[in-house]
Amino acid sequence: MALFHGVINSKALMKDTTLSMIVPSDDRKNIGFQGQPQLLILLHGAGGSNYTWSKYSSIERYTEPLNLIVLMPNIEFSFGLNMSNGLNYQSYLGEELPQWAEKTFGLKLDRETTTIAGQSMGGFAAIHTALAYPDKFGKCGVFSAPLA
């Protein structure tokens, strides 16, 4: 398992944006490592960033035995919505980020292999994105989120 922090250019956001990711190691002795990895897009709450999950949780330890790529994008205070100022966070989460993962990691994603989840504001973003893109996300995790 490896943890990376980096910057990618987003067309949906019209800017460079930060992204953290956990990638399974090449050590395939783990039981769950048959086939390609699944994808989890994991979103932070208000006031957080792409560093929040890796800094304040045990996400690395929990995902280590799994064949799972975890993308933790910085969604700022957007609630994961497309905004009138052109910052299209929902498009970024539902379209651009899964496409980026497919190209970067050579994945063939479908709704059975792609999950979106988040805490608080990130949970709001996760459920709204999952409902907007039901063909992309087969699972959605929501932790302590406002749902209105």
Short names for language-model regions:
Residues 1-148:
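Non-catalytic cap/lid and distal C-terminal segments of serine-dependent acyl enzymes
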